[in-house]
């Protein structure tokens, strides 16, 4: 009996935030412009000092930088305010002192699907190339469950094919969940309230899957939605399933940016120049009449529009004057980012590529706390040289990881890797890196996860904004959680604002 198609299709372990979606961390740093454009003395009424042709963008991740580029092209004056001392938001490549032999790993947003056309177009605009990941990386990887170690293909073919068939039953049920939902308006679906009050766990429980199939499905959902299934709105799942493209298995998580994903936000920021102001966390927003005044990094900035291209979590520390409407404030307070963490270890030899089970790719699905892992060097480098193995922790595993120190988190994953791959036992891993996104002050998690009861209430608010304020970022797109989502959102907001008044 043949195993199922790629058992991690659709949102296949996406921070890949998405990510995640979705979207990760970026490694560019710089200094603030000595005279940031749009700086002014504080005014009593934003409408009096507002720059009619200026847009203030908060956040220099892919969403904010995309919006800024489009707005500049449309004739707007733009100021981009970034709280960190680097651009990129949740796109961050770790290299340099962290690893040797020129190796690098993505701490945040990682893989690109073949249908991520807006992101690929942006890469093409800046002359950046991609490098391919192995087409069969998942089925050629390792599944470690209850002491059993098999290739994922063999595991899925277990019980004379019943495991794979049961796994596919989950996805067949998703096909029937809400086949006529409009992903642009999930809140208007006729069963919106019913689905929104239910969790993904409720849906999976009703299927009564075989334990092995449930293990694979839970791994899919935990990685894809950056949370435990009981924390995810079923209406959000229906929306994401509806918007997903029908991509062949080899086209999912197919590539990375050659040389590191952080090159894209760096190139975008370089083109924008000194309109990007770093080390400028926003503390206050005044919004009235025909403009806004933003206080950030000790300076004030007047504009006609404000684009908040950042997660909602850091906005909870911003003072809005007057207070935002109740529905907007509730969405900002309620929409969380799922916890996500990555741990990357450098090994002198890629022991995972020659496993006794026949697994060769390094892609790992395990019932140990790390959950999911893959080779961060499966798209470049010497196959016979040193390599990087990265754990991607989400859900409960990520919450536990966030409670640990970096050293504790690394040591725990190193032990778990040695259990999953006994041949790694004793290999020295002096070169390591980790990021727990829930502990990142200006992010607060991996990528957005609407809880039960939130989609119908929050989605219209997220898309519409309020007054002179608009929202961008992966959490605002029909397809959520990807770097592609962030780029799409930037294009969308810029198109909504159009051209400046003459």
Where are the regions a protein language model picked out?
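FAD-dinucleotide binding site
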Residues: 3, 10-25, 35-502
């Amino acid at each position: 009996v043949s195993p199922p198609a790629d058992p991690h299709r659709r949102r296949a372990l996406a921070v890949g935030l998405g990510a995640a979606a979705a979207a990760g961390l970026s490694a560019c740093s710089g200094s603030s412009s000595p005279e940031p454009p749009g700086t002014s003395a504080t005014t009593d009424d934003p409408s009096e000092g507002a720059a009619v042709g200026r847009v203030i963008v908060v956040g220099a991740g892919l969403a904010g930088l995309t919006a800024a580029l489009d707005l500049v092209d449309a004739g707007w004056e733009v100021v981009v305010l970034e709280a960190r001392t680097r651009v990129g938001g949740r796109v961050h490549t770790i290299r340099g002192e962290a690893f040797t032999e020129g190796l690098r790993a993505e701490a945040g947003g990682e893989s690109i699907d073949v249908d991520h056309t807006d992101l690929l177009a942006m890469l093409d605009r800046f002359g950046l190339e991609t490098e391919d990941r192995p087409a069969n990386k998942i089925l050629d990887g390792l599944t470690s469950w209850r002491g059993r170690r098999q290739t994922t293909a063999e595991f899925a073919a277990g019980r004379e094919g019943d495991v794979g068939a049961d796994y596919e039953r989950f996805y067949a049920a998703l096909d029937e969940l809400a086949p006529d939902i409009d992903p642009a308006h999930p809140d208007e679906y006729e069963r919106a309230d019913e689905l929104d009050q239910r969790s993904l766990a409720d849906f999976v429980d009703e299927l009564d899957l075989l334990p092995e199939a449930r293990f694979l499905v839970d791994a899919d959902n935990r990685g894809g939605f950056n949370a435990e299934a009981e924390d995810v709105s079923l209406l959000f799942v229906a929306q994401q399933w509806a918007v997903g493209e029908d991509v062949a298995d080899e086209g999912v998580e197919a590539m990375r940016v050659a040389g590191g994903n952080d090159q894209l936000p760096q190139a975008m920021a370089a083109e924008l120049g000194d309109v990007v102001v770093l080390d400028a966390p926003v503390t206050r927003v005044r919004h009235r009449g025909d403009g806004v005044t933003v206080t950030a990094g000790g300076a004030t900035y007047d504009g006609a529009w404000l684009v908040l291209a950042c997660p909602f979590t850091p906005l909870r520390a911003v003072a809005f004057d007057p207070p935002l409407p109740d529905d907007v404030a509730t969405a900002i307070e309620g929409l969380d980012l799922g916890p996500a963490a990555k741990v990357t270890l450098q090994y002198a030899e890629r022991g995972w590529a020659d496993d006794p089970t026949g697994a060769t790719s390094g892609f790992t699905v395990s019932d140990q706390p790390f959950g999911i892992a893959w080779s961060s060097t499966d798209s470049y480098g010497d196959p016979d040289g040193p390599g990087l193995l990265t754990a991607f922790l989400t859900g409960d595993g990520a919450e536990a990881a966030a409670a640990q120190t970096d050293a504790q988190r690394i040591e725990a994953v190193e032990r778990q890797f040695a259990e999953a791959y006994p041949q790694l036992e004793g290999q020295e891993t002096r070169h390591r890196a980790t990021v727990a996104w829930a502990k990142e002050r200006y992010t607060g998690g991996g990528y957005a996860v609407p809880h039960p009861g939130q989609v119908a209430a929050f989605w219209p608010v997220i898309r519409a904004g309020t007054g002179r304020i608009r929202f961008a970022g992966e959490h605002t797109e029909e397809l959520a959680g990807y770097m592609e989502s962030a780029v799409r959102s930037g294009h969308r907001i810029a198109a909504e604002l159009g051209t400046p008044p003459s």
